[in-house]
Amino acid sequence: MLPNAMASNHVMPSGAPPVLPKADYRNAMARLGAAVNIITTDGPAGRAGFTASAVCSVTDEPPMLLVCLNRSASVYPAFTANGVLCVNVLAAGHQALSGLFGGKTPMDERFAAGRWSRKATGSPVLEDAAASFDCRVVQATSAGTHDVLFCEALAIAIGGAAQSLIYFDRRYHEIAAPPH
């Protein structure tokens, strides 16, 4: 059984927890391969999007996932005000698009580089994504510098791509599903 680290009476055996060097933590996290996603929103606060690898399935009943969003990101106000988003899982060949959404490129230029449609929430859905999850944000929790957005999927699209894009060791890699 795991210890209940959240309990108020829990104390680490050595007293205060050690402070990890930020560079060591970031270097170790670079070894945690992850899918590359473009997260989009549209609504009263405008259209916005960013590249993220901090996305995770939460539950399938109801269908829910989480997205981590830095509170200092320029897109933060649009996402929090709109309350809806689409997680677009990038297929192989989307490295350039990921770079546009991961940098300081103006929003109009980001969206001009892809083909987009809409589903239930009105958030932009990347037409050639490996998969897309169109969601409403049902809960947000602050953790350090980020908000963790819990998102209920209202619609999905599954693309025909047999290859996906992952980020590992600070580089993009393409992976393919084995033949059936």
UniProtKB/Swiss-Prot annotation:
It holds the Pfam family Flavin_Reduct. It is an enzyme of class 1 (oxidoreductase). Coiled coil: none annotated. One of its GO terms (biological process) is uracil catabolic process. Its EC number is 1.5.1.42. GO terms for molecular function: FMN binding; FMN reductase (NADH) activity; FMN reductase [NAD(P)H] activity; riboflavin reductase (NADPH) activity. It catalyses: FMNH2 + NAD(+) = FMN + NADH + 2 H(+). Keywords: Flavoprotein, FMN, NAD, Oxidoreductase. SMART domains: Flavin_Reduct. InterPro entries: Flavin_Rdtase-like_dom (IPR002563), NADH-dep_flavin_reductase (IPR050268), RutF (IPR019917), Split_barrel_FMN-bd (IPR012349). Catalyzes the reduction of FMN to FMNH2 which is used to reduce pyrimidine by RutA via the Rut pathway. Belongs to the non-flavoprotein flavin reductase family. RutF subfamily. This is FMN reductase (NADH) RutF.
